[in-house]
Design a protein with these regions (language model features):
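Catalytic core of soluble alpha/beta enzymes
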Residues: 1-138
Length: 138
C-alpha cells in the first residue's frame, strides 16, 4: 500500500505494474499542481476527480483540463454515504470524462448517480462510450 506522499513508490509502481493503471487520489487531491508533478514524474495515469479535495470547482476543472491535455484519465468519484444531490457525476458528464467511480446502487446517492448517467445516455443517444481498449495492458 502506497502512502499519499510516496512519490517514489508511485513512480516505481507505475513502471513495474505494467498491466495496471495507477490513478491518483490522495496523491493528487484534484490539485492541478500535484497532478502536473505526478504526470512529469510518471507517477500516475489519471486522477480521481473530487472538487471538495481542492476546494473549488474552478480548480477541479483546471485539473481535468490538464489531465485531458496530457492524455490522463479523469474519474469523478461519487461518495458512498454522501448526499443525494452531489454534483460530481453531473460534472463528469458535462466534462465528458472517461469513467466514473460509484458504489453499488444501494443508497439514494448511488441511485442518483446511476440515474444521472442514464439520463445523459437518453439525452445523447449518439454519444459513444469511451474506448478503454488502448489502455488495457493484458
Amino acid at each position: 500500500v502506497l502512502d499519499e506522499n510516496d512519490w517514489e513508490g508511485y513512480q516505481i509502481a507505475t513502471k513495474e505494474l505494467t498491466r495496471t493503471l495507477l490513478i491518483g487520489d490522495d496523491l493528487t487531491v484534484t490539485n492541478p499542481a500535484l497532478l502536473k508533478r505526478a504526470h512529469e514524474e510518471s507517477a500516475v495515469q489519471g486522477f480521481i476527480f473530487k472538487p471538495n479535495q481542492i476546494g473549488t470547482i474552478t480548480e477541479a476543472v483546471e485539473a481535468h483540463r490538464y489531465a485531458k491535455e496530457h492524455n490522463m484519465l479523469t474519474i469523478p468519484s461519487q461518495r458512498g454515504g454522501g448526499t443525494i444531490w452531489d454534483v460530481v457525476i453531473d460534472l463528469g458528464v458535462g466534462l465528458e470524462t472517461e469513467a466514473c467511480k460509484s458504489c453499488a446502487p444501494r443508497g439514494g446517492e448511488s441511485v442518483y448517480a446511476m440515474n444521472c448517467l442514464y439520463r445523459a445516455a437518453q439525452e445523447n443517444p449518439d454519444a459513444a462510450l469511451f474506448d478503454f481498449s488502448p489502455l488495457v495492458k493484458f
